[in-house]
């Protein structure tokens, strides 16, 4: 069955393994996870739990700022006996009977050695050219070349008379939802609500991440 938890990426560091190897790890803080809702096949068409992470500021009248919860979010969280949450996700393929609404989910859900998938929003790079954005090759940089970092041909002239959808062109790079699969949990620090994950995970420091059991590695 799937296990899952939400958290924030704190940054990277390194730890020593039992055999003395130096292991690069990403530190993920995962406290304040609360079950907001249980979904069942009879009512919702599928089984899942809805988990919320990190408290949001209470509803403020006449404020449209996203840092304040709205009334529906407050009412939804009130049913679970908790405050509105900033980061909410659902986890399917879980044993719903093991959870109750309002229950807290701790980092002890996972153990050292577990194989996990981590989902986050990649770092935004702004507007970039085709070479950086799509890893295309440069043209000749020598004297006389008219083609250095341009994207090249984007399609035929008279026959198609248009640029096809999906053509790799300059544009905004990053800021996409990315999942890195089959990462290893190196260490669990229950006292500080921290998970140490081997390697790097998507997103900037303080970015929200979603950790689930590996869809491939645990079969």
Swiss-Prot record:
GO cellular component annotations of the record: cytosolic large ribosomal subunit
Keywords assigned by UniProt, alphabetized: Ribonucleoprotein, Ribosomal protein, RNA-binding, rRNA-binding
Gene3D superfamilies named in the record: 3.30.160.810, Translation factors (2.40.30.10)
Residue segments, region Disordered: 62-81, 136-156
GO molecular function list: rRNA binding; structural constituent of ribosome
Biological processes per GO annotation: translation
The organism's place on the tree of life at top rank: Bacteria
Record InterPro entries: Ribosomal_uL3, Ribosomal_uL3_bac/org-type, Ribosomal_uL3_CS, Transl_B-barrel_sf
Cross-referenced Pfam families: Ribosomal_L3
Classification via PANTHER family: 50S RIBOSOMAL PROTEIN L3, LARGE RIBOSOMAL SUBUNIT PROTEIN UL3C
Similarity comment: family membership: Belongs to the universal ribosomal protein uL3 family.
NCBIfam families reported in the protein's UniProt record: L3_bact (TIGR03625)
Chain's role: One of the primary rRNA binding proteins, it binds directly near the 3'-end of the 23S rRNA, where it nucleates assembly of the 50S subunit.
Assembly and interaction partners: Part of the 50S ribosomal subunit. Forms a cluster with proteins L14 and L19.
Protein known as: Large ribosomal subunit protein uL3
Phylogenetic placement of the source organism: Bacteria, Bacillati, Bacillota, Bacilli, Bacillales
